[in-house]
Amino acid sequence: MKIGDVEVRDDVFNVKVKKHVLWEVVKWQLAKRRQGTHSTKTRGEVAYSGRKILPQKGTGNARHGERGVNIFVGGGVAHGPKPRDYEYPLPKRVRKLGLKMALSDKARNNAIIFVDNIDLGKKPKTKKAIEFLKNLGVEKEKVLVVIPEKADVLYKSFRNLPNVRVLLPEGLNVYDVLWANKLVIQKDCLDRIYKKVEA
């Protein structure tokens, strides 16, 4: 299969897309990102006395015990959130398959652009980054740029643009691929992308 003038592997860029697999991987990724630091106090943790607030009988009011129960304002929360880890295991095979499907989906929609080199000069300039995107005709799209090595000039030039994300091939993931309308990939990243979906 060819994308532009680049020959790519069918088993990575031309796989049958199953939406459910993509959904599974994205759900797993977002669950992993959750902080899970939410916390509420139960009736045992709120700062109230355990004294009975009114007699059991004779007042005409409903029966009550202490002030810290969940039915009172300022009382504890019943079944509220406690700190927890939302991460759960997802088979590697499914994760790799998800990435292949996401790349295949973009390839099918002509949303992948291969470039020989991304040269924005020696100093970070957002202006040059915008020019680069304009030359590719993707300045108004959400763009994922895949580069072969960490380059401060590239990261800093693109980071001021809210619709652009920059990743190394090893950091390529289903969520970011699906987020982008266009993928701009430097040609010498291809082998490392293949390695990622095989490893």
Curated annotation (Swiss-Prot):
The keyword RNA-binding applies. The keyword 4Fe-4S does not apply. InterPro entries: Ribosomal_uL4, Ribosomal_uL4-like, Ribosomal_uL4_dom_sf. Keywords: Ribonucleoprotein, Ribosomal protein, RNA-binding, rRNA-binding. Pfam families: Ribosomal_L4 (PF00573). GO terms for molecular function: rRNA binding; structural constituent of ribosome. One of its GO terms (cellular component) is ribosome. GO terms for biological process: translation. Part of the 50S ribosomal subunit. Belongs to the universal ribosomal protein uL4 family. One of the primary rRNA binding proteins, this protein initially binds near the 5'-end of the 23S rRNA. It is important during the early stages of 50S assembly. It makes multiple contacts with different domains of the 23S rRNA in the assembled 50S subunit and ribosome. Forms part of the polypeptide exit tunnel. This is Large ribosomal subunit protein uL4. It comes from Aquifex aeolicus (strain VF5). The gene is rplD.
